[in-house]
């Protein structure tokens, strides 16, 4: 789209992919935030540009958070969205279905799968929500955008180090910071290189708030006054004084 627009200098806005990191600090109430983190990662079975693609959890709450996320994953019914009780539907197409299965195998090789990981037999591109622990930043599952129901949970012990790790990506669409101390979380959020950083929530997009990515996650903004301004051009009328 950008290349096609270049020849005639058309202005464009681009909202592209992301590898959103969730940074979970050491003072969180794990039982309170785990369902929100799960929903932030697995909404539409992970097929949302601003879904949480990787979680960094402080070592002091790491095991508890992994256990909570694993339980939520095991409880989430996957199937036909028209059927009562279904929480998560299928992958959108076979290409993405096969791609996500590949990421599951990456997770199996590089970490430990604690929930999901097995693709059911039968028709449909159904993959259960999969939680992977004991994995590091060099795995493809962490470095790339999986766009599907596979969530790596990575351990950290130093906040400055994890900010650097979260920023070590070509993407910059969204991200979130989770803490019982919002002032502390805000200071962390200021250092994360993304177009939007949520505190104690994720993927909360509102029509009056501008949204857009940085780095390879996009150009310009949509929504809000800034989004409307993308479709306007500044005009100056300069009149000589008598």
Task: For the regions a language model picked out, list residue spans one by one.
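Conserved C-terminal structural/oligomerization subdomain of aldehyde/semialdehyde dehydrogenase
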Residues: 23, 77-78, 104, 119, ...
